[in-house]
Amino acid sequence: NEPAAYNTELKPGGGWDMWRKIAAQDPSFGHPDKFCSDPEQTNWMSATVETLDQRIIPYIKNICKRDPFTGKVVTGGIVTVKDSSWLMSWTINRQPQFREQPKDHCLVWVYSLFTDKPGDYVKKTMRECTGKEICMEWLYHIGVPVDEIEDMAEHSANTVPVMMPYIDAFFMPRAYGDRPKVVPDGAVNFAFLGQFAETPRDTIFTTEYSMRT
């Protein structure tokens, strides 16, 4: 019943702090501030909706044309609400996702790209919304009657939001050299791994990219 914390502090000892200290030693070690200096450009927000009864399920079935409790594919990918002011998307993977998950509960992953714009049903920005309010916005977009939305968000779902200030950092505009080479020129006994290491002809945002570095 509270909005997710929006904490942009880069704490000492964290990954960004370490990269800054490394980069200060040589220009070839990259420029981390190109990626971590503007959280308004790099933040992204999501929420996990857990259905608690069968009231929401028919609306999911109506869109997916699948029963989420068969143990098979449900959405088959991301469902994007094109006319959402938040540019909301949601997806449901094979259920159950966790061993202890009740068999009649469904987990839905909801996220939005525009966390600073008012919603279409809840007239608040996503970052200002509680989990319940985010659920209400989602229920509105999947076709739940307006007079049932608040009650269903309150009693038929449990929604937990999370704000990630730097999750889109690797998409920030950059120049060659802003990311260090995996093995910088002249390096002998060290290398850079992960999303912020420069790898030719490859695209970030995947686990595979990190593994290939």
Region roles according to the model:
Residues 1-212:
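C-terminal segments that line or cap access tunnels to active or ligand-binding sites in enzymes
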